Amino acid sequence: LLLLNDLDSGGYMIQIKSKLDCCGCTACASSCPKSAITMVPDEEGFLYPKIDMRRCIECGACERACPILNKKTVISEKTEGYIIRIKDNKILYESTSGGAFTALADYILEQNGIVYGAGYDNNMRVVCKRATTKQQLQEMRGSKFVQSDLGNIFQDIKKELKEGTTILFSGTPCQVAGLLSFLRKKPDNLLCVDFVCRGVPSPGLWDNYVKYMENKYSSKIVGARFKHKTYGYHTSTMKIDFANGKTYYGSGRVDPYMKAFVREISSRPSCAACAFKGIERPSDITVFDCYEYSKITGRKDDNRGYSSIFVHTEKGGKILEAIKSHIEIQEEDVNSLVTENGVMVCNSAKPHPRRAEFYLLAEHYPIDEALNKIEPITLKDKIIEKSKRFLFKTGLITVARHLNKGKKVEVVENK
């Protein structure tokens, strides 16, 4: 699978026969005892491993750490399904769905533990961050539709686990698999929380979008929410805050970054054949949306958001039990949650046929111009977007949502 080719620079590049076989989890780089492997962006902006053979001792640690080369069959202790929602209304509003991550993370912090999850650096790049206080958790809250840069986080986590610290690591399924493959075993003081993932766009494309928006609004971005509940949970929207006090809202109809994402134009190549799909997972808890709350439970949906979760391990079950006073919770059939909310639990999204062309364009054009050549934002899109505020205030947005419900994600079945 891994080939070494000499570069003009004198280094060597780990090349993957197919980019479907590298998820960018950093397990190989983190495992190298000589720090011979670095993660470098390709032409699309996704990180891939590069090896310096002047440092390499050919020990094979990198190959042993790869979660795709060494994929393990996962047999969960007993996966249970639940719908939950945090009781704190402020946190619920700030959360993408039902606030499950915050409820779990708060508990870990209360046990003097440490939480790792996606946040922003000073340049609005999405990176894995470390939280020891509830204040630091705030920027981890909410979805980030960008592949986060893990840096040396795996090594930091390994050190803290050895010291006996309780750790919650939250990430994509491939990041969780990468961490566990790097560690070689799952310590008792590690709680892994993954989520049902549609795919991860590249950090390079996100940089393109940030520059485009900052030029358009003549101001630096100071905050970003990919699925803000401005118009309710079921009609979430991108929200961007600028240093000059302006705020932008745009859904997947009119926002170029979000439209590229929902049209399956921007995800990493390996996402098209994700190796980590399925109900049974190496994580302790899996979190995903619960859009069909009424259909599953027969109760009214107030459009403020719920989380579907799978509990895979006894450890996950004990922590769920410990946070019950902070959440609304009801047990539901696992297969019902998958059928109604979880098409992406077991399937990969089928990539857009012009995906490669889009990324070539994005190398040379701002994201809006690149997207316009592939999936133009139409006048109809703009009219519908402008009508959302009126529809939300009058309650008609619920009717519009039901009329639009027939559209489904095209998927590739993962065998």
Predicted regions and their residues:
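Immediate flanking context of iron-sulfur cluster ligation sites
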Residues: 14-22, 53-57, 164-167, 254-269, ...
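Local cysteine-cluster metal-coordination motifs and their immediate loop/turn environment
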Residues: 20-35, 57-69, 172-178, 267-279
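Gly/Ser/Thr-rich loops at beta-strand to alpha-helix junctions
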Residues: 96-99, 122, 169-179, 199-201
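Conserved nucleotide-cofactor-binding alpha/beta core module
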Residues: 143-168, 173-192
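Short, flexible loop segments at boundaries between secondary-structure elements
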Residues: 191-212
